[in-house]
Design a protein with these regions (language model features):
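A structural signal for multi-pass alpha-helical bundles of membrane permease subunits
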Residues: 4, 11, 20-348
């Protein structure tokens, strides 16, 4: 079945019913609700700073045309004005209220007063590449990016190892209090982050990891979601495989490394995707732990573009769009594991 046939199929072959129309409206509306903000942010990241706040806004990145006029020490913006019913292109010298002083750029003479309601800016398609180059060269954005990659990769690897070990013990070993421990781990999902944030910070202070990337990584390694997801998947692995390995004198670690982990690959891929999204987008905990600019992660570094009296939206939008690229690539490469991994765990 090709994509067109799949998208245009109906509940009753050859007939379009009300439910089909409602389904299409719902799906199209949901798709637009997701795509429009992303497309708007992408287009706005290419606009010059002045164009981002211009009203009425435009989707395409445009900028006012600037012209050099003899007798003026700076370029003047070009406008289309209506004078005596005729449209002309003139350069604006200054603007006071609803009146603007305009001159002819080709033959400058005394400024002419024009009503601002009778003029519109001359614009051209412009891509503001400085929105991307300035943060990379002037604001240590590459350092923020490197720190985020380090935190994300290391935290994800440790999360997979620690959660897989805990899930292996809870799924394949029988001991007193096994279910109680599992329930206790799952119950931590109901505890808000703000409740444990202060105790976690005091622990980080006690071990001397404040303003250290390891202070961001270590407290986030063990996750109840990861333990639950991997345990549920490991329960589907036959115990006979483990017993056969023990008969062949395989150690518990070898069983875990050579048998359990390969068979749990779909669930590990799902947890890896979740972990990358969590670590890459984490803002509050790195903001609390880190204080030196050279240790900032990407999300904390983006906050530096927001001052007390001004916000550099052109830089924020450009760097936000750029920061979406790594997690998008990870998701595209691992998305085929999501359905099989979650289906195997029984997770809703």
């Amino acid at each position: 079945m090709n994509a067109v046939t799949f998208l245009t199929r109906t509940r009753r072959p050859g007939r379009i019913g009300l439910t089909d129309i409602l389904s299409w409206v719902w799906l199209i509306g949901g798709t637009l609700a997701v795509l429009i903000p992303v497309v708007w942010a992408a287009m706005s990241s290419l606009k010059p700073e002045a164009e981002i706040t211009r009203f009425p806004p435009s989707l395409l990145p445009r900028a006012a045309v600037q012209v050099e006029v003899p007798g003026y020490d700076r370029p003047l913006s070009l406008w289309t004005v209506t004078i005596d019913g005729m449209e002309r292109e003139m350069a604006m010298v200054r603007r006071v209220g609803i009146k603007a002083q305009m001159v002819d750029p080709a033959n400058p003479g005394p400024p002419v007063s024009v009503d601002t309601r009778e003029m519109s800016p001359v614009q051209k398609l412009t891509i503001a590449t400085q929105n991307f180059t300035d943060p990379l060269t002037q604001f240590n954005f590459l350092t923020f990016l490197k720190n985020s990659v380090f935190v994300t990769v290391v935290a994800t690897v440790l999360t997979l190892i620690v959660n897989a070990m805990a899930a292996f013990a809870l799924s394949k070993y029988r001991f007193r209090g096994e279910k109680a421990i599992f329930v206790l781990i799952i119950s931590t999902l109901m505890i808000p982050l703000t409740v444990v944030m202060v105790p976690a910070y005091l622990v980080i202070v006690g071990v001397g990891l404040v303003d250290n990337l390891w202070g961001v990584i270590i407290p986030t390694v063990a996750t109840p979601t990861g333990v639950f997801l991997l345990r549920q998947y490991m329960l589907t692995i036959p115990d006979e495989l483990i017993e056969a390995a023990r008969v062949d004198a395989a150690s518990e670690f070898r069983i875990f490394w050579r048998i359990i982990l390969p068979l749990t690959a779909p669930a590990l891929a799902v947890l890896a995707i979740f972990s990358v999204l969590w670590r890459w987008n984490d803002f509050l905990w790195p903001l609390i732990v880190l204080s030196s600019r050279e240790n900032f992660t990407l999300q904390v570094g983006l906050n530096a573009f927001q001052g007390e009296f001004s916000v550099q939206w052109h830089y924020i939008l450009a760097m936000t769009f750029l920061s979406l690229a790594p997690v998008t690539v990870v998701f595209l490469f691992l998305q085929r594991y999501i359905t099989t991994g979650i289906a195997g765990t029984g997770m809703k």
